[in-house]
Every structure is written in structure tokens, then in C-alpha cells.
Amino acid sequence: MDEILIKLEQILEQRKSAKADKSYVSSLYNKGTDEILKKISEESAEVIMATKDGSNDKIIYEIADLWFHTLVLLRFKKIKVEQITNELSRRFGLSGLKEKANRNN
């Protein structure tokens, strides 16, 4: 799984130097955080609607869009996929209640 995320991360990084009129991702980078967050919000809503109304195929499609736009945000903020997978690994085996309690400390 990490392999496709790493490949996407590399492509998204390359898009930073592309012309905005030639690259959707570059146009998002040029518009900045608010536009990227707007797309993530839209995609989140589409996941919710697909879950309520759609088939599993539609849910998968919409979650792929959400993950993609989340990866765009990560690259925009210079956060690597590895940092996210490291955080998930850190949480693995930790109960959700304990992890939540640790956030307050």
C-alpha cells in the first residue's frame, strides 16, 4: 500500500513546478490552503453521500478522491507520507481511549 502512496507523493511534488494551466494539482497549489481545504471538504461530503446512498464501488471511488486531495495537502504543507504512516504505526496497539486521553496530556 505504501508504494502507491509514495509514487503519488513523488508525482504531487513534481506538480509543484508545473504550470497551473496545465496541471490540476499545480492549480490547487497556486490557489493555496483554502482551496485545498475546500476540495477536501467537498470530497468528504461526497464520501458521506456515497456511504448513505451508494454501492461499495462508489464509496471506494469517493474515498480515493478524498485520499488524493489529502495527499495534495500533505505535499503542500511539506509533510511526507512516511510521517503519517509512522504516526499510525505509533498508535497501533494503543487503545483508542488511551490514545485520546494521551492527547490531553
Swiss-Prot record:
<dbReference type="GO" id="GO:0004636">
    <property type="term" value="F:phosphoribosyl-ATP diphosphatase activity"/>
</dbReference>
<dbReference type="GO" id="GO:0005737">
    <property type="term" value="C:cytoplasm"/>
</dbReference>
<keyword id="KW-0028">Amino-acid biosynthesis</keyword>
<dbReference type="InterPro" id="IPR021130">
    <property type="entry name" value="PRib-ATP_PPHydrolase-like"/>
</dbReference>
<dbReference type="GO" id="GO:0005524">
    <property type="term" value="F:ATP binding"/>
</dbReference>
<keyword id="KW-0368">Histidine biosynthesis</keyword>
<keyword id="KW-0963">Cytoplasm</keyword>
<dbReference type="GO" id="GO:0000105">
    <property type="term" value="P:L-histidine biosynthetic process"/>
</dbReference>
<keyword id="KW-0547">Nucleotide-binding</keyword>
<keyword id="KW-0067">ATP-binding</keyword>
<comment type="similarity">
    <text>Belongs to the PRA-PH family.</text>
</comment>
<dbReference type="Pfam" id="PF01503">
    <property type="entry name" value="PRA-PH"/>
</dbReference>
<protein>
    <recommendedName>
        <fullName>Phosphoribosyl-ATP pyrophosphatase</fullName>
        <ecNumber>3.6.1.31</ecNumber>
    </recommendedName>
</protein>
<keyword id="KW-0378">Hydrolase</keyword>
<dbReference type="InterPro" id="IPR008179">
    <property type="entry name" value="HisE"/>
</dbReference>
<comment type="pathway">
    <text>Amino-acid biosynthesis; L-histidine biosynthesis; L-histidine from 5-phospho-alpha-D-ribose 1-diphosphate: step 2/9.</text>
</comment>
